[in-house]
Swiss-Prot record:
The keyword Kinase does not apply. Keywords: Chloroplast, Membrane, Photosynthesis, Photosystem II, Plastid, Reaction center, Thylakoid, Transmembrane, Transmembrane helix. It holds the Pfam family PsbL. It is found in: Plastid, Chloroplast thylakoid membrane. GO terms for cellular component: chloroplast thylakoid membrane; photosystem II reaction center. Its main location: plastid. GO terms for biological process: photosynthesis. PSII is composed of 1 copy each of membrane proteins PsbA, PsbB, PsbC, PsbD, PsbE, PsbF, PsbH, PsbI, PsbJ, PsbK, PsbL, PsbM, PsbT, PsbX, PsbY, PsbZ, Psb30/Ycf12, at least 3 peripheral proteins of the oxygen-evolving complex and a large number of cofactors. It forms dimeric complexes. It comes from Emiliania huxleyi (Coccolithophore). This is Photosystem II reaction center protein L. The lineage of its organism: Eukaryota, Haptista, Haptophyta, Prymnesiophyceae, Isochrysidales.
Length: 38
C-alpha cells in the first residue's frame, strides 16, 4: 500500500476525527431535513 509510517498515531487520530466530523454533518443534515420537511 504505502511506506511504513513511524508516526502512525496522529494519522489515525486525524482519520477518526474526520469520521466523527462526517458523522456529525450527517446527523445535522438529517435534523435540518426533518425540520424543513415538517
Amino acid at each position: 500500500m504505502s511506506a511504513p509510517n513511524p508516526n502512525k498515531q496522529p494519522v489515525e487520530l486525524n482519520r477518526t476525527s474526520l469520521y466523527w466530523g462526517l458523522l456529525l454533518m450527517f446527523v445535522l443534515a438529517v435534523l435540518f431535513s426533518s425540520y424543513f420537511f415538517n
